[in-house]
């Protein structure tokens, strides 16, 4: 199956000395510690991956439809290599040649396709040496991005926490075998730059469906399906309020020891960032001023609750929650607002509104 093709994909990458980027919200499809791994492209992903793929002459897209959230400009960088030749393989014929024009495509199993491709390449050049110059380029790209991200994430010791500092702390404390489910929203997207996995099927996300409130219910299912793996659900306070908070009682009643991490910034971050950038900070429905203490609420339901508002508390709280073997909620108090929110999902999607009736003139963006 496509999910079991890691050995073949790794063999192909190593034979070609080809850098590997993860598609959007699939941070678990290639080992992050591999010399050729560059991280995820797409919204709030890895600049190393984006800077690398934009130099490509050929892109081999395996088991991905190359959706728009994974190929549109990010960090003010247009990185998708429009002039590169594209080879695409997927079992679903409907995604082939859909979002990006493929020069060659194959409707087939990625594992079988990749194995046969490597076999044919080895017959043509059995002793192909590794490209040391390319390995050095990949290493430099990753080191540069790591330094940028560290500077971005380590600048604040404040309480409440800068969200990027918070994301760095909790992702560093993740157990190696952890399964992480992520929701949609500004904070949930920001962690795409931080989540790293060495195994497959460790990152479960809402993908392009955008179904807010996804992560906690998905985590319950993951824990039932993989009871020996630590399972962490990450949500913002808006998404958690949709479904997560109510389902803590389910986790307690059914003894499903999932850890929920709630980034509480008292706002719908994605919507607020659009209103900051496109509506001159005229806010409608963007604020959540009356959130309860989700840690205390979890304890009232019979779960363990942790409230953290300083970076030094985060790692210990997550480690204690995982070790407890009980349903847990970590209520993380983070900063919100225009100084810390990530860029909008789509800078090209909104234009300033035009009002044609005088009675609505007072609503015009300034």
Task: Place the predicted regions along the sequence by residue.
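Active-site diphosphate/adenylate-binding microenvironment
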Residues: 6-9, 140-228, 277
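Conserved thiamine diphosphate
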Residues: 55-56, 95, 103-104, 113, ...
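Phosphate/pyrophosphate-binding active-site segments
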Residues: 83-184, 311, 320, 326-366
